[in-house]
Amino acid sequence: MFPMVTEFMNYGQQTVRAARYIGQGFMITLSHANRLPVTIQYPYEKLITSERFRGRIHFEFDKCIACEVCVRVCPIDLPVVDWKLETDIRKKRLLNYSIDFGICIFCGNCVEYCPTNCLSMTEEYELSTYDRHELNYNQIALGRLPMSIIDDYTIRTIFNLPERKT
């Protein structure tokens, strides 16, 4: 008779323990239910990028002195700088400047080391195309400023993301 009573007691203890574990899991689920969603609906919602975001490079043709520092500091020798030496004034004249964003790793060395600050990083990160040759930007394409995300009325911008607890 005693073995049967102890089995019922063990069964009762196991049932209470299982209910407690299920309750703990349910409480964790409920605590996550009132948090803001982490996922954004990308084409319709966009995050505001930080000031230090390394997006597409903006180039100012008038400021460039064709010193080629950007080419020397680039880990993959990417910027193509074509210049002509003006013998009468003994200065280089910039003819063409281009960057292939299909190869660029967006390290920002060219922007950091440019002595005249003619290069800057923008907040533009949507560079996808169907043809990789369209990613080769010349000085005209590099000179265009991107449309600001805040000014685009077709999308909802998300300013504050919920902070993750670690």
Swiss-Prot record:
[4Fe-4S] cluster 1 binds at C64, C67, C70, C114. [4Fe-4S] cluster 2 binds at C74, C104, C107, C110. Binds 2 [4Fe-4S] clusters per subunit. InterPro entries: 4Fe4S_Fe-S-bd, 4Fe4S_Fe_S_CS, NADH_quinone_OxRdtase_chainI, NDHI. Residues 55-84, 95-124 form the 4Fe-4S ferredoxin-type domain. Keywords: 4Fe-4S, Chloroplast, Iron, Iron-sulfur, Membrane, Metal-binding, NAD, NADP, Plastid, Plastoquinone, Quinone, Repeat, Thylakoid, Translocase. Its cofactor is [4Fe-4S] cluster. It is found in: Plastid, Chloroplast thylakoid membrane. It catalyses: a plastoquinone + NADH + (n+1) H(+)(in) = a plastoquinol + NAD(+) + n H(+)(out); a plastoquinone + NADPH + (n+1) H(+)(in) = a plastoquinol + NADP(+) + n H(+)(out). GO terms for cellular component: chloroplast thylakoid membrane. One of its GO terms (biological process) is photosynthesis, light reaction. It is a peripheral membrane protein. One of its GO terms (molecular function) is quinone binding. Signal peptide: none annotated. Its EC number is 7.1.1.-. Belongs to the complex I 23 kDa subunit family. NDH is composed of at least 16 different subunits, 5 of which are encoded in the nucleus. NDH shuttles electrons from NAD(P)H:plastoquinone, via FMN and iron-sulfur (Fe-S) centers, to quinones in the photosynthetic chain and possibly in a chloroplast respiratory chain. The immediate electron acceptor for the enzyme in this species is believed to be plastoquinone. Couples the redox reaction to proton translocation, and thus conserves the redox energy in a proton gradient. This is NAD(P)H-quinone oxidoreductase subunit I, chloroplastic. The lineage of its organism: Eukaryota, Viridiplantae, Streptophyta, Embryophyta, Tracheophyta.
